Amino acid sequence: MSAIQVKQVVKQYKNGVQALNGISLCVEQGEIFSLLGQNGAGKSTLLRILTTYLQPTSGRITMLEKDLCRDAASLRSQIACVAQQTSIDTYLSLEENMLLQSRLYRIPKRDAEKRMETLIVDFGLEPYRRYPVSSYSGGVKRRLDIALNMMTNPKILFLDEPTVGMDVQSRIAMWGMMRKIRDDFGVTIFLTTHYLEEADQLSNTVCIMKDGKEVTQGSPAQLRSLLRQNSIEITFSSEAEARKGCGILKEQMSKEILLRAEKLLIYTQTPQSDIEAA
């Protein structure tokens, strides 16, 4: 089941700048989805739209089976977003930061304390309880920021370049934390990143975007195949027709087929023979 479906979304600002140019993508529930792209590709704009800070100019977004624009208020309680700038208060203790988050969302105190203890242990934050938050390293502050956003028990967690500026050890610890959130808590993670290695190591699905539009989307293995193999791209009149064509071709061909909006990508070393066989 899809957690997020983005269809032909356009975002044009009042100054005429078009940040998104008809982007389409699909995020499945319970996966780590990485959005990979350079500065200016449109990642931040899409993230702001998905977290209800901006409205798209056109297109449609479905999140958790609800229309994002129409049901934004009800969806806000089911998602959490960790920005590049941490939102923790360095004048509060670790526990105070986490319990403050729970009070903002009106979580009962007993439930909040139980949730807090689980997150502190599971995310390896217990050794830091005795130290002031102001003394934490950047990596530990980022992990605490994610933990306090998990206090609300979100169904989707948005992470905006969570490992930027981290050393190797901190980055590896963060990767482990993200896997645990997906595997043990069942939370869908939508991750933006500059790092190809990070997307490859963590993701169930990677979407590469450029100039406000997706270039391709698939598993890391599919994207590696795209780089090393010949491919055929078939464009249909609609996404529905593309899905129908995908089903027919999968019955006739043994090659890997990737569905991307109204297009199909067929990966093959011998494209001509596969076309004749179909």
Write out the residue ranges for each language-model feature.
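Walker A (P-loop) phosphate-binding loop of ABC-type ATPase nucleotide-binding domains
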Residues: Q38-G42
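Helix-to-loop junction immediately C-terminal to a conserved catalytic motif
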Residues: T51
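Conserved ABC transporter NBD signature motif
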Residues: G59-R70, S74-L75
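Conserved ABC ATPase "signature" region
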Residues: L99, R103, R110-Y128
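Catalytic Walker B motif of ABC-type/P-loop ATPase nucleotide-binding domains
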Residues: L157-D160
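ABC transporter nucleotide-binding domain
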Residues: G176-Q269
